[in-house]
UniProtKB/Swiss-Prot annotation:
It comes from Caulobacter sp. (strain K31). This is DNA mismatch repair protein MutL. CDD domains: HATPase_MutL-MLH-PMS-like, MutL_Trans. GO terms for cellular component: mismatch repair complex. Disulfide bonds: none annotated. GO terms for biological process: mismatch repair. The keyword DNA damage applies. Keywords: DNA damage, DNA repair. InterPro entries: DNA_mismatch_repair_CS, DNA_mismatch_repair_MutL, DNA_mismatch_S5_2-like, HATPase_C_sf, MutL/Mlh/PMS, MutL/Mlh/Pms-like, MutL_C, MutL_C_dimsub.
């Protein structure tokens, strides 16, 4: 079969198949061009799922009459220029586009028209393309001072086979909306609007550059809940900077669709970045739950290759281990700084459920008479408390609480101290200790335990849930989930300090590896020993395992070493061992925690609350479920119609 040269029209259609997969792809390319042109406002319209009509208008620098026909030639672009030696460097790309394929590719499969006025020019021009056939440049009317207006009609009319693979108009419209959302999150200083079939879907004004403007844009796109439950990320390592916002572990989703990743301002879908994000949350989420995040990576253009995918949706890093380590480390540091915070949506969901179950038919209480209750026999173990009808457990029901109550006046300063003594024993200050502010004859300032972040324990419900009162609401704690997290964090702390118990193998095991893999593993011998795995070199391509972590019990040492070798090759870190140890710690913490059904004293409940406040990640258990729910007083009052 002879080799033939393909005609330009066929070449363009082949390129269009790679670059323009669907209407959302065409819009992405046109929006990229607008951003590269310096636009501050971009308007997008779509009809018929983008197949009937697409319009992208911007206020960028525009194109002159001479540039319009050149822009429609393949591989003609304003975004690359030769250096002093006349070389065209594809590793120094600072723009969204650079190949010069978008306009000719779209023009080869659709009816394309471009109207534009160049900045500083009084004249506007237009050009038409139909099925790859380029018309002449002609004068045109243009409303703005400068910019471009690109209209695409009958997308893929020249390639009918492609239309058979399009999804429904609704699905294509959703893809277009998602694309504009990603572009808007990547460029907070640019205003965006999107109309689909004449209906306004998105309208976003420009925001000020910086963290606050970015958070405002993310809130507008992802919702106020994301803003209320996000923590800021800002860390730099070896010239790579990671910024953005990540959701609390308890603010999670059932899929990874709410993970937005950007590299040098470019929206990407990259497995390395998604894997790093997942690894950072591995301690906090169940396997079927996914974190939410909008992360922005900035690095020198020479350290990343964006020319590895036709649609520029994927990138390749020169040092992937550095990028992965930065993401995992920065996210874990930020999550630790979040302390005991839990998602605000947890309480909202609980309130919605309460409202749904508490709908009372009109007139249901028509026969109710205030103060009609005349009293009666009190439940066993309870005594009347004050005149308001409230009851509290008697000392026989909650042993140990009476010891605290006897030493503390109600609402007095010593409540916390008494609780602490009941839980941990009395404490005598050493002599000659200077207290801040000194002592005086004046009475000590009154401190109310409800001022603690998680409040003061008031009751235990069903011997499973702790009810605590805060200054402006109520906190309900799952005692098992909370204590499980506390035990787990304590075990992780011991592991991080290198206090991992080891078990010696009766017969040291030889593991054969590729020589390069064996060298990498042996180079990390000291790090692995701190995690309980003692190895040494056993000649080229072999490793001798002498001791393994006692936590793992009887384990497959050879399989563990091979997994570590794979981790070192791919990520530069021995993640397999850490993950296995943490998984075992999680299981041990679950079985060694306070179980549901155990009755706690008031001192024990308050001690648990105080430890939660001082422990990172205590807002969720090891499986990603919330450990507590906080109901604001205002929300409770709304339930009873007081607001």
């Amino acid at each position: 079969m002879p080799i033939r040269r393909l005609p330009p029209e066929t070449v363009n259609r082949i390129a269009a198949g790679e670059v323009v997969e669907r209407p959302a792809s065409a819009i992405k390319e046109l929006v990229d061009n607008a951003i590269d042109a310096g636009a501050t406002r971009i308007e997008v319209e779509a009809h018929g799922g983008g197949l009937t009509r697409i319009l992208v208008a911007d206020d960028g620098c525009g194109l002159s009459a001479e540039e319009l026909p050149v822009a429609l030639e393949r591989h003609a672009t304003s975004k690359l220029a030769p250096d002093a030696q006349g070389l065209w460097d594809l590793l120094a790309i600072h723009t969204m586009g650079f190949r010069g394929e978008a306009l000719p590719s779209i023009g080869s499969v659709a009816r394309l028209s471009i109207s534009s006025r160049a900045k500083g020019s009084s004249d506007a021009w237009s050009i038409l393309v139909e099925g790859g056939s380029v018309g002449d440049v002609a004068p045109a009317a243009f409303a703005g001072d400068h910019g471009a207006r690109i209209e695409v009609r009958d997308l893929f009319y020249a390639t009918p086979a492609r239309l058979k693979f399009m999804k429904s108009e609704r699905a294509e419209a959703l893809a277009i909306t998602e694309e504009i959302k990603r572009q808007a999150m990547a460029n907070e200083s640019v205003g965006f609007s999107l109309d689909i079939d004449g209906r306004r879907i998105i309208r976003l004004p420009p925001e000020h550059p910086g963290p606050q403007g970015r958070l405002a844009r993310l809130s507008a796109v992802l919702g106020r809940d994301f803003q209320d439950n996000a923590i800021e990320i800002d860390q730099t390592r070896d010239g790579v900077r990671l910024t953005g916002f990540a959701g609390l572990p308890t603010y999670n989703r059932g899929n990874a669709a709410h993970q937005y990743l950007f590299v040098n301002g470019r929206p990407v879908r990259d497995r390395l970045l998604q894997g790093a994000l997942r690894a950072a949350y591995a301690d906090f989420l169940a396997r079927d739950r996914h974190p939410t995040a909008a992360l922005y990576i900035s690095l020198d253009t020479s350290e990343v290759d964006v020319n590895v995918h036709p649609a520029k949706a994927e990138v390749r890093f020169r040092d992937p281990a550095l990028v992965r380590g930065l993401i995992v480390g920065a996210l874990r540091h930020a999550l630790a700084g979040a302390g005991h915070r839990a998602s605000t949506t947890t309480a909202a969901s609980a309130l919605d459920a309460i409202r749904a179950q508490s709908m009372v038919p009109p007139g249901a209480y028509s026969g109710y008479q205030p103060n009609a209750y005349q009293g009666g026999p009190s439940p066993a173990g309870f005594s009347a408390w004050q005149a308001g009808g409230w009851t509290r457990p008697s000392p026989q029901v909650l042993p140990g609480l009476s010891d605290v109550s006897a030493r503390v006046e109600p609402g007095g300063y010593g409540v916390a101290e008494a609780v602490r003594e009941a839980a941990f024993g009395e404490y005598d200050a050493p002599p000659n200790v200077a207290y801040p502010g000194g002592f005086s004859e004046d009475p000590a300032p009154v401190f109310d335990p409800v001022d603690f972040p998680l409040g003061a324990a008031r009751a235990q419900v069903h011997e499973t849930y702790i009810v605590a009162q805060t200054r402006d609401g109520v906190v309900i704690v799952d005692q098992h989930a909370a204590h499980e997290r506390l035990v787990y964090e304590r075990m992780k702390g011991e592991m991080a300090a290198g206090r991992v118990a080891r078990q010696a193998l009766l017969l040291p095991e030889v593991v054969e590896l590729d020589p390069a893999e064996a060298e990498r593993v042996v180079a990390r011998a000291e790090e692995l020993a701190a995690l309980g795995l003692v190895i040494e070199s056993f000649g080229p391509g072999a490793v001798l395992v002498r001791e393994t972590p006692a936590l793992l019990g009887k384990t497959d040492a050879a399989g563990l070493v091979r997994d570590i070798a794979d981790d070192l090759a791919e990520n530069g870190q021995a993640l397999a061992l850490k993950e296995r140890l943490e998984e075992v710690c999680s299981t041990m913490a679950c079985h060694g925690s306070v179980r549901a059904g155990r009755r706690l004293t008031g001192a024990e409940m308050n001690a648990l609350l105080r430890e939660m406040e001082a422990t990172p990640h205590s807002g969720q258990c090891n499986h990603g479920r919330p450990t507590y729910v906080e109901l604001k007083l205002a929300d409770i009052e709304r339930l009873f119609g007081r607001r």
